[in-house]
């Protein structure tokens, strides 16, 4: 199993932008501990599993939105979708109380320093979700005032495609983030300086579903899907 080790860089100039991190491919660090000492290695793996379970099932989002994707994100908090099922219904007004930030909308150039400051105010462990085509790559706004992707100035953990993505896509993104958190390796105690975070290299949904989509031969029209949706919701 391969992991990505993220280390902080200390030689950055003050005018350098995000991401201020370097990445390299390494093996799971817990495997070495198990080889050295079976008991403490297994105990460390069990503790990581318990801590990651708690983190993944109590993800509090920061209440922050930029554009129309934010409307779809907040729709996931309504009764019909009920994001509370996944422990992520507690919107926080302060970044210091949030676990992850969703960049939902168009990241304009003048908003970059604001977003960076809010991200810096979040406590570790923290994650970033890029939601929508504009946040992922600038979308249709290939102009001077729009940053062509959040990953130009923030380390992004998850990308949600769509323009805008449906609330179901946001919920699926939460589930994928929880799956990624369950495979993380972080220090279990207080650490000063570099934390040495290990993240598993997750396979993208596009790659995972590629063969299934290619093999599909019967495609439904948008009108058929709309009729099915209307019947499920009791509409005429």
Curated annotation (Swiss-Prot):
It comes from the Bacteria. It is found in: Cell inner membrane. Its main location: membrane. One of its GO terms (biological process) is electron transport coupled proton transport. It is a peripheral membrane protein. Keywords: 4Fe-4S, Cell inner membrane, Cell membrane, Iron, Iron-sulfur, Membrane, Metal-binding, NAD, Quinone, Translocase, Transport, Ubiquinone. It catalyses: a quinone + NADH + 5 H(+)(in) = a quinol + NAD(+) + 4 H(+)(out). The keyword Chaperone does not apply. It is an enzyme of class 7 (translocase). Belongs to the complex I 20 kDa subunit family. NDH-1 shuttles electrons from NADH, via FMN and iron-sulfur (Fe-S) centers, to quinones in the respiratory chain. The immediate electron acceptor for the enzyme in this species is believed to be ubiquinone. Couples the redox reaction to proton translocation (for every two electrons transferred, four hydrogen ions are translocated across the cytoplasmic membrane), and thus conserves the redox energy in a proton gradient. This is NADH-quinone oxidoreductase subunit B. It comes from Blochmanniella pennsylvanica (strain BPEN). The gene is nuoB.
């Amino acid at each position: 199993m391969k992991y990505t080790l993220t280390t902080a860089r200390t030689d950055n100039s003050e005018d350098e932008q995000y991401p201020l991190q370097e990445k390299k491919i390494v093996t799971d660090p817990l495997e070495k501990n198990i080889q050295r000492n079976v008991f403490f290695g297994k105990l460390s793996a069990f503790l990581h599993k318990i801590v990651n379970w708690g983190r993944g099932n109590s993800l509090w989002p920061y209440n922050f939105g930029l554009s129309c994707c934010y409307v779809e994100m907040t729709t996931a908090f309504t009764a019909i979708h009920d994001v509370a099922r996944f422990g992520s219904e507690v919107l926080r007004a302060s970044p210091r109380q949030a676990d992850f930030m969703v960049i939902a909308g168009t990241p304009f150039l003048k908003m970059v320093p604001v977003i960076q400051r809010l991200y810096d105010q979040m406590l570790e462990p923290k994650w970033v979700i890029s939601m929508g085509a504009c946040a992922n790559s600038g979308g249709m706004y290939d102009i001077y005032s729009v940053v062509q992707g959040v990953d130009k100035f923030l380390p992004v953990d998850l990308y949600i495609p769509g323009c805008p993505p449906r609330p179901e896509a946001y919920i699926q993104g939460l589930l994928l983030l929880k799956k990624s958190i369950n495979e993380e390796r972080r220090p279990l105690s207080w650490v000063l300086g570099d934390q040495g975070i290990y993240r598993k290299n997750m396979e993208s949904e596009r790659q995972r579903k590629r063969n299934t989509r290619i093999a599909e031969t019967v495609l439904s029209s948008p009108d058929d899907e709309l009729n099915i949706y209307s019947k499920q919701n009791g509409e005429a």
